[in-house]
């Protein structure tokens, strides 16, 4: 499935983690189709609603970013990657901390499965460092480098393994772009508007305009759209910010 990336709306990924039931989730999909480029299904939504939720979005003409961050032994991740391709998603994630061999097997699985199905392979994205973590958290876990240094190392490893790109903090976009090239896809979560959102656990954040101006290919936005009085209007406002960032 080809991903259009030639306009501002296509760069906006909505994090679909509804607090209600399946009907509420589908209501959001129907409301936001045409206002966002892709719907991100994470662990919460996928565990609650299952693969049929992906199918429901695809049937409505939406594109899906399956963000399950596969992180296991290479063979297990390769099989999970095959399943993701067969689901028909446009993009899915693995975790770069799984190592080069794991990522290489995932890349190989995606290519082989897509070729057998006669389809364009989905975009395979490797998660670097979660935006909820800062340098002190890494130190607690035994890392001897900063979040930015680790993200860059993992991005280079992902590129060398053949991944399409990475998920990385907005602050890490510039060094990753410089090291990995202009065709390396960078997806940035941790996107917030000027208003503080209740329950926010993100630590390393930027606005949509700032992230795109720094070179992000896609931005992921959840709460600022989902909790808005009018989610579609909120999505359109973010699209306008993306346009401003592209013109920077």
Q: Where would I find each of the regions flagged by the language model?
A:
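Structural motif
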Residues: 34, 60, 87, 161, ...
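Conserved, mostly hydrophobic/aromatic
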Residues: 14, 39, 69, 92, ...
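Short, acidic/polar
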Residues: 19-32, 74-83, 147-157, 203-210
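Conserved anion-binding
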Residues: 8-10, 76-164, 169-172, 179-183, ...
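C-terminal helical cap(s) of enzyme catalytic domains, especially alpha/beta-barrels
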Residues: 103-113, 212, 225-248
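Glycine-rich phosphate-binding active-site loops on the catalytic face of alpha/beta enzymes
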Residues: 87-101, 202-234
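Conserved beta-strand positions in the central sheet of alpha/beta enzyme cores
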Residues: 13, 37-40, 65, 93, ...
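N-terminal amphipathic alpha-helix/helix-capping segment at the start of soluble metabolic enzymes
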Residues: 1-27, 116-119, 174, 178-181, ...
């Amino acid at each position: 499935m080809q991903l259009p990336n030639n306009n501002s709306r296509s760069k906006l990924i909505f994090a679909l983690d509804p607090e209600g039931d399946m009907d509420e989730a589908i209501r959001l999909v129907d409301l936001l189709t045409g206002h966002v480029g892709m719907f991100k299904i994470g662990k919460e939504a996928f565990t609650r609603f299952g693969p049929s939720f992906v199918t429901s979005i695809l049937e409505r003409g939406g594109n899906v970013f399956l963000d399950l961050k596969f992180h296991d032994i290479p063979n297990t991740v390769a099989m999970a990657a095959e399943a993701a391709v067969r689901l028909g998603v446009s993009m899915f994630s693995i975790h770069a901390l799984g190592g080069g061999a794991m990522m290489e097997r995932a890349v190989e699985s995606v290519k082989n499965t897509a070729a057998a199905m006669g389809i364009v392979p989905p975009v395979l994205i490797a998660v670097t460092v979660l935006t909820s973590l800062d340098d002190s958290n890494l130190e607690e876990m035994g890392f001897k480098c900063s979040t930015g240094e680790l993200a860059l190392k993992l991005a280079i490893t992902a590129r060398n393994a053949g991944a399409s790109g990475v998920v990385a903090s907005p602050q890490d976009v510039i060094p990753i772009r410089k090291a990995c090239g202009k065709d390396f896809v960078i997806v940035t979560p941790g996107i917030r508007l000027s208003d503080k959102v209740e329950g926010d656990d993100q630590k390393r954040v930027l606005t949509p305009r700032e992230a795109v101006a720094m070179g992000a290919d896609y931005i992921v936005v959840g709460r600022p759209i989902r909790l808005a009085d009018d989610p579609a209007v909120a999505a359109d406002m973010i699209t306008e910010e993306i346009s401003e960032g592209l013109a920077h």
